Regions:
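A detector for small-residue-rich transmembrane helices and their helix-helix packing motifs
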Residues: 1-173
């Protein structure tokens, strides 16, 4: 999304932008996070609800970017990638699996930490980077990441099966 002319109706760009990426590294980074966190959330929601959740958080992230950048030079900046939807998955992971262990690289070693620490550090980085880069010149839509994350946290329980049952997570150590 952005406010530029496109060959498709502008409202469609909210959907299509989720499936476009600016570079191979952008795509690979998003797919890495989706691979680590997405399967758990899909298990919690089922295939159809997960697809709807993914699209909803991606569209909410894109709309937030457009609203916050609707004037000036930033309005012509395209916003694309799955990062807003992936951020939604991370928000859902924080709500549904805060204590599940996640492997992270720390000082050239693999360390298992609770999900709330791994996701919390990622979110803190998004917040700080978003405030530092308010001009939007860095090429990263931090506002979309933050909006997708918050949307994911809000939608996680209503869209999952976990709210209806006592959650027992066998991977908590």
């Amino acid at each position: 999304p952005g406010l530029m002319q496109t060959p498709i109706p502008p409202w469609m760009t909210l959907f299509t932008a989720i499936f476009m990426h600016g570079s191979i590294m952008h795509l690979l980074g998003n797919m890495w996070f989706l691979w680590i966190f997405g399967d758990n959330i899909e298990d919690d929601m089922g295939h159809v609800k997960y697809l709807l959740f993914y699209l909803a958080t991606g569209i909410i992230a894109s709309l937030t970017f457009v609203v916050l950048n609707a004037s000036g030079e930033a309005s012509l900046t395209p916003c694309l990638g799955a990062s807003g939807a992936i951020s939604g998955v991370l928000g859902a992971y924080l709500v549904l699996h805060p204590h599940r262990r996640v492997s992270v690289i720390l000082l050239r070693m693999m360390v298992d930490v609770p999900g709330y620490i791994a996701v919390g550090i990622w979110f803190l980085f998004q917040l700080v980077s978003g405030f530092v880069d308010q001009g939007g010149g860095g090429g990263v839509a931090y506002s979309a990441h933050i909006a997708g994350f918050v949307a994911g946290m809000i939608l996680a329980k209503p869209m999952s099966f976990a709210w209806a049952r006592e959650e027992t997570d066998p991977l908590i150590v």
